[in-house]
Amino acid sequence: MSFKLSYRAAAAALAFCAAFAIHPAARAQADLAVAAAKEKGAVVTPSGLVYRSLKDGSGASPLASDVVKVHYRGTLADGTEFDSSYKRNEPTQFPLNGVIPCWTEGVQRMKVGGKAKLTCPAAIAYGPRGAGGGVIPPNATLQFEIELLDVAKR
């Protein structure tokens, strides 16, 4: 059985959260997700991931158990870049099931050669713990631009 979350349902839920958020940062998190869901071609999954293909690939799609090689850029809701393999001029490689759930889910939707934008609510990112010694604050909604370069079976 396939479950599709409609744009309206996602936008309504996120707007409700934004309307009653006390902290301005919490409102920015919800605003980011709502804006991402409105982008042309965006798909909102049941987990809350907002996936948008920027460039379709033509190679293999990875399984969660595969090792992937990617280039990526990660930003906070305010646009602050917190990490970039592009800046290091070095792609990174990792087992797909060894990263945040947002990446595991989102990268499996890609094909080698493709590029996508993932908007990750905190629940499928770093949650209340945050990461990077405070670089990624607790309960942060994150955006990633990911380019899938290669897939290797584990």
Model-predicted segments: where are they?
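Cross-family detector of peptidyl-prolyl cis-trans isomerase
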Residues: 2-154
